[in-house]
Amino acid sequence: MKLTGEVALITGGASGLGRALVDRFVAEGARVAVLDKSAERLRELEVAHGGNAVGVVGDVRSLQDQKRAAERCLAAFGKIDTLIPNAGIWDYSTALADLPEDKIDAAFDDIFHVNVKGYIHAVKACLPALVSSRGSVVFTISNAGFYPNGGGPLYTATKHAVVGLVRQMAFELAPHVRVNGVAPGGMNTDLRGPSSLGLSEQSISSVPLADMLKSVLPIGRMPALEEYTGAYVFFATRGDSLPATGALLNYDGGMGVRGFLTAAGGADLPEKLNINREGQE
């Protein structure tokens, strides 16, 4: 186990990628505190992991709630080694032309308050503990932090902002705290949208992402949630990732290396090399 004795705090950790991260970190020997708005899902998480996980019901937009989560983690486990600001909302690729003029301000605030301010609050709340433990921060970014069409202008702007946060925080917190970012691609989660656009009850799981990404990604399929968690484990380890701070990992199935005519240039390699891979796909 790679994280034996370590303690992590994860925001938005009761569902989706966050829950997969909790499961993986506990499996690697860590103890985990989770800040999430769903009391029911937090109870399920605590039952599943016993004394290795504690939940705090709260709003990532509130610095006081973030401080309560940090205090609960310290009370339960004595330290914070890794912080993963992960909670977010999506704009469902609402284009600028489709944003009603009377809702732009509210939608901007909704998305930026969760996706950017929530991350800043998390670091602020945990900073003394992270400096004390010489720990690390691993921000969840998105492919939208690097490429267009991963969302609309509001979501894309928030994720580009997180890229800037990684770099600035890596500078400000050095040499005491390492700060890195993981930019996953599409995944099947319960990610919701802003209430200002009437999207708070819509889930990204209703979008047929797996079918859409199959022909788009060079790896040929949409990764499962648990397949995204390894990068976070890597950045959280103290030995293997010691030189890494300010690092941005595109972990999206190869979006940046797609070809113009086809996503994967080597799709016919087994045929060319007379390799029989029947039953291995």
Curated annotation (Swiss-Prot):
Residue numbers binding substrate: 142
Keyword tags: Aromatic hydrocarbons catabolism, NAD, Oxidoreductase
Annotated GO MF terms: cis-2,3-dihydrobiphenyl-2,3-diol dehydrogenase activity
Enzyme class (EC, first level): oxidoreductase
CDD domains from the UniProt entry: BphB-like_SDR_c
GO biological process assignments: catabolic process
Entry annotated with the keyword Magnesium: no
Gene3D superfamilies: NAD(P)-binding Rossmann-like Domain
Catalytic activity annotation: (2R,3S)-3-phenylcyclohexa-3,5-diene-1,2-diol + NAD(+) = biphenyl-2,3-diol + NADH + H(+)
UniProt superkingdom: Bacteria
Catalytic-site annotation from UniProt: 155 (proton acceptor)
Pfam short name (any one): adh_short
Annotated positions binding NAD(+): 10-34
EC numbers, comma separated: 1.3.1.56
Pathway listed: Xenobiotic degradation; biphenyl degradation; 2-hydroxy-2,4-pentadienoate and benzoate from biphenyl: step 2/4
Family: Belongs to the short-chain dehydrogenases/reductases (SDR) family.
NCBIfam families on file: BphB_TodD, PRK06200.1
Annotated protein name in UniProt: Cis-2,3-dihydrobiphenyl-2,3-diol dehydrogenase
Species of provenance: Comamonas testosteroni (Pseudomonas testosteroni)
